[in-house]
Amino acid sequence: MSAAIAALAASYGSGSGSESDSDSESSRCPLPAADSLMHLTKSPSSKPSLAVAVDSAPEVAVKEDLETGVHLDPAVKEVQYNPTYETMFAPEFGPENPFRTQQMAAPRNMLSGYAEPAHINDFMFEQQRRTFATYGYALDPSLDNHQVSAKYIGSVEEAEKNQGLTVFETGQKKTEKRKKFKENDASNIDGFLGPWAKYVDEKDVAKPSEEEQKELDEITAKRQKKGKQEEEKPGEEKTILHVKEMYDYQGRSYLHIPQDVGVNLRSTMPPEKCYLPKKQIHVWSGHTKGVSAVRLFPLSGHLLLSCSMDCKIKLWEVYGERRCLRTFIGHSKAVRDICFNTAGTQFLSAAYDRYLKLWDTETGQCISRFTNRKVPYCVKFNPDEDKQNLFVAGMSDKKIVQWDIRSGEIVQEYDRHLGAVNTIVFVDENRRFVSTSDDKSLRVWEWDIPVDFKYIAEPSMHSMPAVTLSPNGKWLACQSMDNQILIFGAQNRFRLNKKKIFKGHMVAGYACQVDFSPDMSYVISGDGNGKLNIWDWKTTKLYSRFKAHDKVCIGAVWHPHETSKVITCGWDGLIKLWD
């Protein structure tokens, strides 16, 4: 048996080699004896067969080809082995939903189906999209239009009619050429037309005759006259006195500064120490619409002037019974701004009816009216004693206009702003004034010189529709529309003080008035939510904030002789006194 196995091994080795190898092998290994191979001889009664079957290339179980038997998660992005096609596209593991439609049962990676990345020419896509939006047809995207003749989706009839034109193509317009008069014979000197010939259907436009021109002039004159009559007429001025007697037993009017209120109202010195107001002590109600602005009587502050969107101006007592003394009626639209002269005997009012009016504070008489047919947004008297006949007004047509009360004429115009002028404030002992505008700039002007010598406009700046000078005359507080109060120096360079920026209130869109306490320890301002905000001047910390009005708190004034009295006004039509 062992001899037979050896012989088989020898024959197995020789089967795969060349002839030379087999010759060398036979020379080295001796042939087995004939007796040992007797069992391999043919049997006469049976077919020849081998007792041992040998497979030269047996199947081997390779580790990489083994399937794990685990279903693939459709969300998996990476597989560590080579799965078969059946594994990759096997249905999702789990019970099938019998109520799913064919579209819902199909594999999806978004709500409406399966989206695959594809390269599309941006121009071609936009061309077909716009064509479909304009004409109602587009090329069928499911067909290869290079191989198949163009097929359209949408309005096929329109596509055939336009011969498949897209929005970026223009078809030839079937229009007849305009015919010209022909006379090309150059020898005809008078009648030769050549290329300058007129069109057959061309109409000559002639200048009107003298008679027609006269008629036209008469018609235009009538229209202009009619238009002038339709222009807004100034409202009739009248006044209402709300107290029984205008003068007291000594013959003094309400302009007389009282001396029995516990405070020296004639003093020029501010109080030594100011305190935070905490409670409401009085409400002045009389306006039927929102109050636009409040102004205290110059120096003493014993009277309060208010203007409102109900077209009225009212004068109130700050001390005593706090009555409404007089109402001034004369504007046909909302009053925007008011300003006392230095003595307080007269005041100006600016309204949306395009009129500026000068009133007598004591009698209520309207002394004069001014207009340049533009809306005045702010008005200011020149504070100098020798210039009480001059005032400036910021207009909606980007100009600052200077009027003389005595003549009623415009004597100067400052027209460098690029937007409507919002505020005017006198600085530097009234030799200069600062103006702000909707063009987001701040300009400084010398009095009576219509060229600004200082222009401040940073890219980060916003419009500043409310500006106030500090009591010591050194700083300008500007209400910026990005919800912060900016402080500029009011002497020499007018630089922004970056250490003094007051934040924490919401004023975007509202020209809320800013004011200082008399001792320069606090800064106050209303906001769009009807709250009164009080900051510390030194630290810029927000000390106090409380609800003052139901609507926008547009004005806030600290009484110049009181330690903690603040007057606020709002769009709820009320004026409130806080202490």
Swiss-Prot record:
Organism: Homo sapiens
Gene3D superfamilies found in the cross-reference section: YVTN repeat-like/Quinoprotein amine dehydrogenase
PANTHER family in UniProt: PRE-MRNA-PROCESSING FACTOR 17
PTM entry text: Undergoes isomerization of the peptide bond between Gly-94 and Pro-95. The reaction is catalyzed by PPIL1.
Name of the protein described by the UniProt record: Pre-mRNA-processing factor 17
Function: Required for pre-mRNA splicing as component of the activated spliceosome. Plays an important role in embryonic brain development; this function does not require proline isomerization.
Lineage of origin: Eukaryota, Metazoa, Chordata, Craniata, Vertebrata
Nucleus keyword on record: yes
Alphabetical GO biological process terms: embryonic brain development; mRNA splicing, via spliceosome
Record bears the keyword Repeat: yes
Annotated gene: CDC40
